[in-house]
Each structure stands twice: as structure tokens, then as C-alpha cells.
Amino acid sequence: MRVKGTNVTRIRRKKMIKLAKGYRGQRHINFKVAKQQVWKSYLYAYRDRKNVKRDYRKLWIARINAASRKNGISYSQLMHGFKVAGIDLNRKMLAELAVSDFATFSKLAETAKKQVSAPTRKAATLDTDIKIERIEKGAAKPVVLEPGKSTKTQEVAVAEKPTTASTVAEIKAYLDSESIKYPSSAKKADLLALVK
């Protein structure tokens, strides 16, 4: 006697048809066609989970660029000015500010414009009434940047001696705080030897 997989087969096929709900034509009725379309849909979903990140980044950059040009500065100069000023806002937040709170965005753009036009870019200062809080790498507490003060003077010094577990940047920060000269191309082992 031939055994037919009635219940199991029906359940399996109904599950696939349920996944194909809303498709046009035979793609939501016929099991064979529905199965192919569901598999193709999974491929589209996988691909577009990657693409949506790119698309949103493009959208944020377009919004920031439009708002920054209203303030007389290009997108690239704005981002460079933020980097020099030590303003760590991501593109998502900047785009949200550009759309919902243009006055604050304008103040930030003015700060960036001053940083770009300043002849010495190293000693950058914030002279707006916006307080920005960020956490320095290796710092014990957040560094608060206040108007009119240099970002260099507010950095927290690394107190403890670096160990082999410390990063090269932390070791260099320690050597800088102790005023120890070191070659810029020095390896981690050479820097640790200078610490001792």
C-alpha cells in the first residue's frame, strides 16, 4: 500500500502559501510557483537589508548638505570644521537637527565655518553657547566642551602607567603627558620600553 504524506504535505504547503500571501496571480495560489517567489523574496530582503543602510546615509548627507549650503558652507567643509572643533555628532543626528531644529544647526554650522576659516586649525575653540559632551578614549570621565575654551586644555590626562594591555594611542598619550620624546613610527614594544 502506498503511503501518502497527507497531513505533513498539506501543512508544509499551506505554510509556504501563507508566506506568499499578497503576491499577484499564481504566485499566491500555486505551491510550486509560490515557493520560487518566496525564495526570491528572501534574496531581495537580504540584499535590501544592506542597501537600506546606504540609502539612509545618502539621505542624511543630502539633508545636511542642503541645510549647510543655506548657511554658506559646503558639506565637506562643515564635516571638516566639526572634526577640527571636536564636535562628535553623527550624520543621523545632524540631519534630524537640520530638519527639525534649524536654529541649532545654524549655530553648529557657524562654529564649523569659523574653524575652517581660522588660520591655525590646531588650537580650535568653541565660542558658541552650545555645550557638547563627549567621552575621550582612555578618559576616566566625559569631557565637557564649553564655549571659549580650547579642546586641548580640557582633555583628561592619563594617570596610570600603561601596561602591555594598553593600546598604542594610550601609551603615546601617557608619554605626551610625561613630556617624553618618542619617534612617530615607534612600535608598541619600543614605546613600552620608554615608559619604564
Swiss-Prot record:
CDD domains: Ribosomal_L20. The keyword Transmembrane does not apply. GO terms for biological process: ribosomal large subunit assembly; translation. InterPro entries: HeH/LEM_domain, Ribosomal_bL20, RIBOSOMAL_L20_CS, Ribosomal_protein_bL20_C, SAP_dom_sf. Keywords: Ribonucleoprotein, Ribosomal protein, RNA-binding, rRNA-binding. SUPFAM superfamilies: Ribosomal protein L20. GO terms for cellular component: ribonucleoprotein complex; ribosome. GO terms for molecular function: rRNA binding; structural constituent of ribosome. PROSITE patterns: RIBOSOMAL_L20 (PS00937). Pfam families: HeH, Ribosomal_L20. Binds directly to 23S ribosomal RNA and is necessary for the in vitro assembly process of the 50S ribosomal subunit. It is not involved in the protein synthesizing functions of that subunit. Belongs to the bacterial ribosomal protein bL20 family. This is Large ribosomal subunit protein bL20. It comes from Oenococcus oeni (strain ATCC BAA-331 / PSU-1).
